[in-house]
Amino acid sequence: MQLNPSEISELIKSRIQGLEASADVRNQGTVISVTDGIVRIHGLSDVMQGEMLEFPGNTFGLALNLERDSVGAVILGEYEHISEGDIVKTTGRILEVPVGPELVGRVLDALGNPIDGKGPVNAKLTDAIEKIAPGVIWRKSVSQPVQTGLKSIDSMVPIGRGQRELIIGDRQCGKTAVAIDTIINQKGKDLICIYVAIGQKASSIMNVVRKLEETGALEYTIVVAASASESAAMQYLAPYAGCTMGEYFRDRGQDALIIYDDLTKQAWAYRQISLLLRRPPGREAYPGDVFYLHSRLLERAARVSEEYVEKFTNGEVKGKSGSLTALPVIETQAGDVTAFVPTNVISITDGQIFLETDLFNAGIRPAINAGVSVSRVGGAAQTKVVKKLSGGIRTDLAQYRELAAFAQFASDLDEATRKQLERGRRVTELLKQPQYQPLQVWELAVSLFSANNGYLDDLDVKDVLPFEKGLREYLKTSHADLIKRIEDTKDLSKDDESALHAALKDFKKSGAY
């Protein structure tokens, strides 16, 4: 059998046409060294800052140092199987995490993988963990409240939707308790909560998750956990991952609340990574960009305008503004708020709630120092009734603290000073609150009203809290209509004031406390 040349060329042509050749062009390099989860790679010429790199064994890393002849990367996860000479490939992608309503009620790691044993997340969307914060034009001023359910915070340092309010204090003085109570109090308030646990013991994180489950708060909460046993890279990334999950709701005209517990541990993790990458250390051995580490994270919490939401959703959501409220936690050493990281975060946030160990040990819990705690923008968001009634409380407390210091040395006090000290003692007692028992607006209003109008002045200090509890029960049974009016209008009319005065007098006469 003989083939002529034209047949051969036709056969070759048909074979070539049927061939699907695809080239996967990817830059690759070689591992030079691996130490403490930090890898040096030679030969990766075309790599982005923050790009994901692919290592053998389905392991990924993050390119952080781009130098002339090598790349410094941090490995996400286990790195024991990576050795010198391994091939590393670029992916052309920035690190992304899953986002969307499917994440609500789940416990995830810093990369968005479920760690609660409830099966896969099945999120339909992913988003980059590093994003630029909304510009000035797209923002709205804070005007709606986030009720924490804590008397001392809602009355003296109110928080608004879209605000960044720092919770700062020494270890073991109730910072996490304030944050968890705030989450529990959001039941039925159409606010998605995200709790980011950074560098905490796994047992502590488990206790928080269990408490959220018991109170039914996990139904509207996402937990992102990077425990103390996880690598520094995971602890560094967890807040950004949580923030991206919160931004999904903010950008679609919903409200979200994110708690970073705590950012001191994130700064430590970032310092560790930076020193291992041989970046020059600065004050307290932190790298030069530790301020930017927190500012770029906290600036992403904002209240965005209706126009921003409409533009982002391509006109699907109209007339709704979204918000992401941040409650970062910072741990101080021996009450030193002038250290590097605390001063940085104080300057970035819109106010701080300062918790003191001395107050905590004295049984004043939540241990809030009213003199140093401020909310720079929350006043505009406070509910009318609380705003009306809380002005006197702050002044009473501030004057009491000042006078109490002098009263230790003075034996004979005039009547006015003595009265002020007595009032201050009762107000201090009134602001105490057990954990996991947040209050509704009407309960807070009634407590403040009774303090402002002198109904506590003739009580023993030890009777203040039983009186408050009894009063709430009495109003629930005998004055349900008054409660409903306060709760619906979030205000106290002249008629309601008279009704409340009458109810308080009746309750005091009954002595049922």
UniProtKB/Swiss-Prot annotation:
SUPFAM superfamilies according to UniProt: C-terminal domain of alpha and beta subunits of F1 ATP synthase, N-terminal domain of alpha and beta subunits of F1 ATP synthase, P-loop containing nucleoside triphosphate hydrolases
Compartments it resides in: Cell inner membrane
Site (Required for activity): S373
Pfam families listed in its UniProt record: ATP-synt_ab, ATP-synt_ab_C, ATP-synt_ab_N
Membrane topology note: Peripheral membrane protein
A single GO cellular-component term on record: plasma membrane
PROSITE patterns reported for this sequence: ATPASE_ALPHA_BETA
Tagged with keyword Manganese: no
An example Gene Ontology molecular-function term: ATP binding
Catalytic activity: ATP + H2O + 4 H(+)(in) = ADP + phosphate + 5 H(+)(out)
Keywords tagged on the record: ATP synthesis, ATP-binding, Cell inner membrane, Cell membrane, CF(1), Hydrogen ion transport, Ion transport, Membrane, Nucleotide-binding, Translocase, Transport
Documented EC number(s): 7.1.2.2
Record-listed ATP binding positions: G169, D170, R171, Q172, C173, G174, K175, T176
Matching InterPro entries: ATP_synth_asu-like_sf (IPR023366), ATP_synth_asu_C (IPR000793), ATP_synth_asu_C_sf (IPR038376), ATP_synth_F1_a_nt-bd_dom (IPR033732), ATP_synth_F1_asu (IPR005294), ATPase_a/bsu_AS (IPR020003), ATPase_F1/V1/A1_a/bsu_N (IPR004100), ATPase_F1/V1/A1_a/bsu_N_sf (IPR036121)
Entry keyword Transmembrane helix: no
Description of how the protein assembles with itself and partners: F-type ATPases have 2 components, CF(1) - the catalytic core - and CF(0) - the membrane proton channel. CF(1) has five subunits: alpha(3), beta(3), gamma(1), delta(1), epsilon(1). CF(0) has three main subunits: a(1), b(2) and c(9-12). The alpha and beta chains form an alternating ring which encloses part of the gamma chain. CF(1) is attached to CF(0) by a central stalk formed by the gamma and epsilon chains, while a peripheral stalk is formed by the delta and b chains.
Function: Produces ATP from ADP in the presence of a proton gradient across the membrane. The alpha chain is a regulatory subunit.
Listed HAMAP family: ATP_synth_alpha_bact (MF_01346)
Similarity section: Belongs to the ATPase alpha/beta chains family.
Protein's name according to its UniProt entry: ATP synthase subunit alpha 1
